[in-house]
From Swiss-Prot:
Propeptide stretch(es), residue numbers: 23-29
Name of this chain's protein: Myrmicitoxin(1)-Pr6b
Keywords, in A-Z order: Neurotoxin, Secreted, Signal, Toxin
Main location per the UniProt record: secreted
Coiled coil residues, start to end: none
Family under the similarity heading: Belongs to the formicidae venom clade 4 family.
Amino acid sequence: MKIIYAFLLIAVVAFMGSGIMAESLAEAIADKPGQAKKIGIFDRITELVNWLVNH
């Protein structure tokens, strides 16, 4: 049971981290400062995987 909770915790942290990274990326590629482009959930997952591979 503890293992299941550990996996769920890791999944939630990874999902939250991908959201934060995607927002930072959206700000970086925005046309104007403070105007972030919308990024979908699959783009967030892709960015998370790319970030994990690069680090």
